[in-house]
Amino acid sequence: MIEKVDYEKVTGLVNSTESFGSVDGPGIRFVVFMQGCQMRCQYCHNPDTWAMKNDRATERTAGDVFKEALRFKDFWGDTGGITVSGGEATLQMDFLIALFSLAKEKGIHTTLDTCALTFRNTPKYLEKYEKLMAVTDLVLLDIKEINPDQHKIVTGHSNKTILACARYLSDIGKPVWIRHVLVPGLTDRDEDLIKLGEYVKTLKNVQRFEILPYHTMGEFKWRELGIPYPLEGVKPPTPDRVRNAKKLMHTETYEEYKKRINH
């Protein structure tokens, strides 16, 4: 266990930070993008976070990152705070525990954005994960695909651990926002959208269910890294397809929380 006095000294490999994030949790947020991710999502807009070694990544202490975040605290109001994303943030769990512990000591709202690929339902893993959850107010859980075969096509990995994490978070009552990226021809099949909606209904802790329309804003990063972009020529979903997905998955069921946040 990390001693409380050492939280500021715990280091992590950080790709970048964003001062005024507005889509990574409630309110205005300071967002930390961690380095490293095992998934290879075809639509990834941060492929520069995949490898643990990257020229942009910097080893930083939790104390240093927290001090940077505090510079923007006045903009957070009653709903904002700190979000840690990636990459996959849980690859560096000690850093997350340290940063979020510093935040909670100051009463700051904490959000974890995760794909949950690292999740393991084992005593050793859960011992540390429970410490993280103790200082995490909200989890943004990305469910890329409910269909296991399609999930492997989309990400290169099974969705078994993701669904196990979703069930665990439901069992402990941790507030969660479920997110699904809608990609034409890849993650927008009606039968799978219906199944995902049915699955989410079985979870007891979902405050919000978001459809994130696919965009091409990260395509240039693939070119910079010399990696062929697998979705070349694929356009964002039409408004009709987005409405269709929301209808099939009954996302409006979870809109009350959104209304409370915005008023």
UniProtKB/Swiss-Prot annotation:
CDD domains per record: Radical_SAM (cd01335)
EC class: oxidoreductase
Record's GO cellular component terms: cytoplasm
Radical SAM core domain boundaries: 23-260
Catalytic activity: glycyl-[formate C-acetyltransferase] + reduced [flavodoxin] + S-adenosyl-L-methionine = glycin-2-yl radical-[formate C-acetyltransferase] + semiquinone [flavodoxin] + 5'-deoxyadenosine + L-methionine + H(+)
Subcellular location: Cytoplasm
Annotated InterPro entries: Aldolase_TIM, Organic_radical-activating, Organic_radical_activase, PFL1_activating, Pyruvate_for-lyase_activase, Radical_activat_CS, rSAM
Binding positions (S-adenosyl-L-methionine): 43-45, 87, 142-144, 215
Annotated SUPFAM superfamilies: Radical SAM enzymes
EC number: 1.97.1.4
Cofactor or coenzyme needed: [4Fe-4S] cluster
Entry's Gene Ontology molecular function annotations: 4 iron, 4 sulfur cluster binding; [formate-C-acetyltransferase]-activating enzyme activity; metal ion binding
UniProt KW keywords: 4Fe-4S, Cytoplasm, Iron, Iron-sulfur, Metal-binding, Oxidoreductase, S-adenosyl-L-methionine
Membrane-traversing stretches: none
Cofactor stoichiometry and binding remark: Binds 1 [4Fe-4S] cluster. The cluster is coordinated with 3 cysteines and an exchangeable S-adenosyl-L-methionine.
Keyword set includes Phosphoprotein: no
Residues at which [4Fe-4S] cluster binds: 37, 41, 44
Protein's job: Activation of pyruvate formate-lyase under anaerobic conditions by generation of an organic free radical, using S-adenosylmethionine and reduced flavodoxin as cosubstrates to produce 5'-deoxy-adenosine.
PANTHER family: PYRUVATE FORMATE-LYASE 1-ACTIVATING ENZYME (PTHR30352:SF5), PYRUVATE FORMATE-LYASE-ACTIVATING ENZYME (PTHR30352)
Protein name: Pyruvate formate-lyase-activating enzyme
Organism: Streptococcus mutans serotype c (strain ATCC 700610 / UA159)
Gene name, Swiss-Prot/TrEMBL: act
